[in-house]
């Protein structure tokens, strides 16, 4: 089971969640109870400051259904690091032959590799311009977490996959979901909308409805209200102050100036 903003802790025999079940023998109808706890933000990531981490293109589009490259993914998570973590691990030496010193993504890839969060295609290549897969993206998210997966995955297509344990952990934390038919599609490229949705879950950046946003925010002609990804895109592309709305959701309280990330692209 998946619940946005929560980690699944297991099945229990009682409503007070004191008797955890590992196996159950069905001889009659039984009621079991799902255990949940709010998922915290990983220690290396900045979940407190809700700044824009996605930038649209020069034509004014955010391209929610386009793929995300491996370099772009490294840059996104580089921006989302806590400042002290980013400065401690900051480097422009990646060890990858295809990540050139003058490339705009060099510091991002190099720093994230130094953290052990991103991996190469081979020992000495990163393939920065290749579209990142759903499995690769889930694995990056899971590497920020220090826990281990508990129980079997509900996905039908990840058994034996190189990222099976990372996918299972990301699912347990409520960060990723599969198709209605139970597939995760690990080798399919992830879209920008899917990536933003997952990142917002990782960071607990979750407006519940359009009324939680503010007038005057940046909006996009290719991410209109009514699209399943509308809230995720708005959250990812607008810097804002916020107030908590219950245990998981948020309500914006002010719009802020977006950070200038160009200093790390030189």
Model feature map: region roles:
Residues 1-22:
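Surface-exposed interfaces of beta-sheet-rich extracellular modules
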Residues 8-11, 34, 112, 170:
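Extracellular/surface recognition and adhesion modules
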Residues 16-38, 104-108, 228-232:
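Extracellular interaction modules
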Residues 37-106, 115-135, 143-165, 177-192, ...:
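Feature responds to low-complexity, polar/acidic, surface-exposed segments characteristic
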């Amino acid at each position: 089971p998946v619940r946005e903003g929560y980690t699944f802790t297991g099945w229990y025999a009682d409503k007070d969640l004191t008797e955890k079940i590992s196996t159950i023998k069905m001889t009659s109808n039984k009621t079991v109870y799902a255990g949940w706890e709010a998922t915290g933000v990983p220690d290396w990531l900045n979940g407190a400051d809700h700044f824009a981490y996605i930038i649209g293109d020069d034509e004014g589009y955010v391209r929610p259904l386009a793929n995300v490259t491996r370099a772009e993914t490294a840059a996104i998570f580089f921006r989302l690091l806590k400042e002290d973590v980013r400065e401690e691990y900051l480097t422009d030496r990646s060890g990858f032959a295809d990540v050139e010193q003058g490339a705009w993504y060099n510091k991002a890839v190099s720093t994230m590799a130094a953290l052990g969060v991103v991996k190469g295609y081979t020992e000495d290549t990163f393939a920065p311009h290749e579209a990142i897969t759903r499995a690769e993206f889930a694995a990056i998210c899971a590497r920020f977490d220090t826990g281990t997966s508990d129980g079997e995955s509900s996905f039908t297509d990840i058994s034996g996959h190189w990222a099976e344990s990372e996918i299972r952990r990301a699912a347990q934390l409520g960060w990723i979901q599969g198709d209605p038919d139970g597939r995760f599609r690990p080798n399919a490229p992830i879209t920008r909308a899917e990536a933003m949705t997952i990142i917002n879950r990782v960071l607990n950046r979750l407006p519940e409805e359009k009324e939680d946003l503010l007038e005057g925010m940046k909006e996009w002609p290719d991410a209109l209200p009514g699209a399943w990804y509308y809230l995720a895109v708005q959250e990812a592309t607008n810097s804002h102050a916020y107030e908590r709305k219950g245990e998981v959701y948020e309500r914006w309280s002010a719009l802020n100036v977006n950070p200038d990330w160009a200093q790390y692209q030189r």
